[in-house]
Amino acid sequence: MKKQGILNSHLAKIFADLGHTDRVVIADCGLPIPDGVKRVDLSLRIGEPSFLEVLDVVESDLVVERITIAEEILTHNSTIADSLKERYTSIDMCSHEDFKREVAKAKVVIRTGEATPYANVILHAGVIF
């Protein structure tokens, strides 16, 4: 049995297989997930687990080169937006409609119980060297 890191076997396998620039989405409970994109649904009930709780765990296991967020988060969810701006220096922004199209390019979408507007992020994998 693993003693540290991600215990979820699906996520551990996906993360081990990621390459440079591969995409991982952490999503609120309302983001539509395109057919054909792997999903790991962690949602238990509204608000649990939260977007930031999941992001904290994923960040501890994944090298993130940059992120992409929907520009609407800046005006509709300043709490999450501020947290993302504190964590990352390389942030791409696009409209929410464009964001949803970009989700189709992800290796996995991790669905949380988050129920606040636009609490979604695309993490672009970096390299450890």
UniProtKB/Swiss-Prot annotation:
Name of the top EC class for this enzyme: isomerase
Any one Gene Ontology molecular-function term assigned to this protein's record: D-ribose pyranase activity
GO cellular component: cytosol
EC numbers on record: 5.4.99.62
Keywords assigned by UniProt, alphabetized: Carbohydrate metabolism, Cytoplasm, Isomerase
SUPFAM superfamilies: RbsD-like
Compartments where found: Cytoplasm
Membrane-spanning intervals of the chain: none
Functional summary from the UniProt entry: Catalyzes the interconversion of beta-pyran and beta-furan forms of D-ribose.
Quaternary context: Homodecamer.
Protein name in UniProt: D-ribose pyranase
The species this protein was found in: Exiguobacterium sp. (strain ATCC BAA-1283 / AT1b)
